[in-house]
């Protein structure tokens, strides 16, 4: 039974049969939901600094709760 995975970059759910799984030389795997996420990761951009990622949205919500 296929299962839903989570994008390791932006945090969104990846439907079965979609997305990209990158296997590193050491055997670790990284799942991407789109080429947008894959390219931003390759460029070394931090997901927490991009407004469209769930990671950044989660941190923004925590900052608002503290204020």
From Swiss-Prot:
Binds 1 zinc ion per subunit. Residues 48-60 have a biased composition (Basic and acidic residues). One of its GO terms (biological process) is translation. A zinc finger (C4-type) spans 7-37. Zn(2+) binds at residues 7, 10, 33, 37. Residues 48-67 are annotated as: Disordered. Its cofactor is Zn(2+). One of its GO terms (cellular component) is ribosome. PROSITE patterns: RIBOSOMAL_L24E. InterPro entries: L24e/L24_sf (IPR038630), Ribosomal_eL24-rel_arc (IPR055345), Ribosomal_eL24-rel_N (IPR000988), Ribosomal_eL24_CS (IPR023442), TRASH_dom (IPR011017). Keywords: Metal-binding, Ribonucleoprotein, Ribosomal protein, RNA-binding, rRNA-binding, Zinc, Zinc-finger. The keyword Nucleotide-binding does not apply. GO terms for molecular function: rRNA binding; structural constituent of ribosome; zinc ion binding. Part of the 50S ribosomal subunit. Forms a cluster with proteins L3 and L14. Belongs to the eukaryotic ribosomal protein eL24 family. NCBIfam families: PRK14891.1-1. Binds to the 23S rRNA. This is Large ribosomal subunit protein eL24. It comes from Haloarcula marismortui (strain ATCC 43049 / DSM 3752 / JCM 8966 / VKM B-1809) (Halobacterium marismortui). The gene is rpl24e.
